[in-house]
């Protein structure tokens, strides 16, 4: 049983953000899956950082160009 799932999720999200920043700046090229990009987009959207959320959506769509979920996330950001 997990001791504190909220804390583990928060730490996992923090690690995803770090990996995303490295990918964005061309440092070490970690693989981020489609779900990771969705979480990153949601993170920046919740922080009201729409330009960064849009960049994350674009990077996600570069790696997963046929992802309906990422297309919908991007469309939601544009509304």
Question: Could you tell me what each predicted segment is?
Answer:
Residues 9-28, 48-58:
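Repeat-mediated protein-protein interaction surfaces in helical alpha-solenoids
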Residues 43-44, 71, 78:
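Residue at a conserved register position within TPR or TPR-like alpha-solenoid repeats
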